[in-house]
Amino acid sequence: RSSDLILVEALSVLTKLTVVGVCDTHRTYTQKIAGILGADPSQLTMDYVGLYHLGWIQDVKMGGRSRMAQLLELLESREEEGLDYDLIELFHMIPTRVTGMYFHRADVVRKQQHCTRFRAEGLYEAEQQILRMYEDPHLDMIPELTRQRDASWYSDSIIPLIQGFEGHAPLTTVACVLNQGSIKDLSDESSVEIPVSVNRKGVKAHKVGLLPRFLKGVFWSIKESDRLTIEAHRQRSFDLALQAMAVNPFVDSITRARKYLEKAASLENINLH
């Protein structure tokens, strides 16, 4: 699985397709926040902005009125798993889990370096077992192991989206689409993850306006990395691919980036010049 964000941008740049990507992160946080507020998730509207899983909930509305102040007040007196309270207190917004990892990335790397087993290794083994289970023609239910591996049920996001396109039920959700002026700080051709309205006529991105100032730099770096990645693919260019990694805020060493790129190109038989 690749990230839908760069695929939306690449397919839009390289083809004439109209592309929409779906990520399940916003639905997870909608349910969590609804539980904190004691509200029905369907009543909430999220002012969400993100790139990949690096997302922020800037506001939460119910019936057109902001409930953000109430949410922040409730969070002061309770401990919710999966929320980064340091970032909430500092920026007065709700970050996603991966956003928390970015702002604590040195700690995350240190923890991974000393762990006995990577999470990916456990997931890989579980996937192999699940695939063997699905070879059984008599299997008529989802294996419990699938639930244990913390699966995301994309059907809960994708089916309503398809129904919205077919005109069965207009939908407001969060999706990966081309920016087209929604975020003023980014180019129209950038793919972004923002609120959209979906109906039989298609998908319409909501206006986001300007990014919070503290987000501008990292978002610009990520989108430049995406642009360089797509251009590297188009030109089959090693230098552009390395540039894409060098400006990516998650990459801390061009030396390691070069070694990784050389190894990946060799293993995957990618012809870069």
Feature names for model-found ranges:
Residues 8-13, 31-34, 58-60:
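Short acidic, glycine/serine/threonine-rich loops at helix termini
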Residues 12-19, 64:
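A glycine- and small-aliphatic-rich helix-loop capping segment at beta-alpha/alpha-beta transitions
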